[in-house]
Amino acid sequence: MDKNRIDGAAKQVKGSVKEAIGRVTGDKSTELEGAAEKNVGKVQRKAGEVADDVRDAVKSTK
Protein backbone atom coordinates (compact mmCIF):
# COMPACT_ATOMS: atom_id res chain seq x y z
CA MET A 1 0.00 0.00 0.00
CA ASP A 2 1.38 3.38 -0.99
CA LYS A 3 2.36 5.71 1.85
CA ASN A 4 0.31 8.51 0.28
CA ARG A 5 -2.87 6.52 0.83
CA ILE A 6 -2.20 6.29 4.55
CA ASP A 7 -0.97 9.87 4.95
CA GLY A 8 -3.85 11.20 2.87
CA ALA A 9 -6.44 9.34 4.91
CA ALA A 10 -4.88 10.71 8.11
CA LYS A 11 -5.02 14.27 6.73
CA GLN A 12 -8.65 13.77 5.78
CA VAL A 13 -9.54 12.73 9.32
CA LYS A 14 -7.50 15.55 10.87
CA GLY A 15 -9.09 18.06 8.50
CA SER A 16 -12.59 16.80 9.26
CA VAL A 17 -12.00 17.15 12.99
CA LYS A 18 -10.52 20.63 12.58
CA GLU A 19 -13.43 21.65 10.36
CA ALA A 20 -15.95 20.39 12.93
CA ILE A 21 -14.17 22.21 15.77
CA GLY A 22 -14.25 25.41 13.76
CA ARG A 23 -17.93 24.96 13.02
CA VAL A 24 -18.81 24.26 16.67
CA THR A 25 -16.74 27.15 18.03
CA GLY A 26 -17.80 29.57 15.33
CA ASP A 27 -14.19 30.01 14.18
CA LYS A 28 -14.56 30.35 10.43
CA SER A 29 -10.79 30.39 9.88
CA THR A 30 -10.31 27.04 11.62
CA GLU A 31 -13.30 25.62 9.79
CA LEU A 32 -11.87 26.65 6.41
CA GLU A 33 -8.39 25.38 7.29
CA GLY A 34 -9.92 22.04 8.20
CA ALA A 35 -11.88 21.85 4.97
CA ALA A 36 -8.75 22.66 2.97
CA GLU A 37 -6.70 20.06 4.84
CA LYS A 38 -9.44 17.49 4.28
CA ASN A 39 -9.36 18.16 0.53
CA VAL A 40 -5.56 17.94 0.41
CA GLY A 41 -5.87 14.58 2.13
CA LYS A 42 -8.40 13.38 -0.43
CA VAL A 43 -6.08 14.29 -3.29
CA GLN A 44 -3.07 12.69 -1.60
CA ARG A 45 -5.02 9.50 -0.86
CA LYS A 46 -6.19 9.33 -4.48
CA ALA A 47 -2.60 9.79 -5.70
CA GLY A 48 -1.61 6.84 -3.54
CA GLU A 49 -4.41 4.75 -4.99
CA VAL A 50 -3.25 5.59 -8.52
CA ALA A 51 0.34 4.70 -7.61
CA ASP A 52 -0.86 1.36 -6.26
CA ASP A 53 -2.88 0.70 -9.42
CA VAL A 54 0.11 1.50 -11.64
CA ARG A 55 2.38 -0.70 -9.54
CA ASP A 56 -0.13 -3.56 -9.74
CA ALA A 57 -0.50 -3.13 -13.50
CA VAL A 58 3.27 -3.25 -14.00
CA LYS A 59 3.54 -6.38 -11.84
CA SER A 60 0.79 -8.12 -13.79
CA THR A 61 2.57 -7.55 -17.11
CA LYS A 62 5.75 -9.31 -15.95
Swiss-Prot record:
This is UPF0337 protein XAC0100. InterPro entries: CsbD (IPR008462), UPF0337_stress_rsp (IPR050423), YjbJ_sf (IPR036629). Pfam families: CsbD. Signal peptide: none annotated. Belongs to the UPF0337 (CsbD) family.
